[in-house]
Amino acid sequence: MDSRSGKEQVAICDRAHHTLQFLDLKGNHKQTLTGYGLPANLDTLGKLMLVPELHARITLLNEKNEVVARLGDNVESVVKNKSVHRAKPHTWKNGKFVHPHDACFAPNGDIYVAEWVQTGRVTKLRKVS
C-alpha cells in the first residue's frame, strides 16, 4: 500500500516490464512509471518511496512519483558493459550496488539494502539530512 500522496493506492513492481504500476483500491490502473531496472520491492517512509532495482541501483521517489535520488547507481558497469558481476566480489566497489534485491527504511530514515550476490551483502545508508 502506498499512502504518500494522502490517498491510498496499490503500488506494484513489474519486473517483466521494468515498470512500477499504480492502481486504486478497486484495481483500476492509475499510473505506470517506466525506466526501472527490474524493480524488486517497495518501501515508504513519509513522502518517500524506496525502489531497489536488481539492475544495480536504489531509486527514491517523492509523493508525486518524481525521482528524488538514485543511490549507488552502477547500471553502466553491471548491466551495460558487464565489468561487475554478482559472483565476483573483486569487481564490487564501495558505494556502488551490484544487485539490490530488497531495501527498507528504518524509522529514523536510514536505509538498509540487501543484495543478491554470491556472499550476500547488506549495506546501511545513514540519513544525513
Task: State where each predicted segment sits.
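Eukaryotic scaffold repeat domains enriched in small/polar residues
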Residues: 1-129
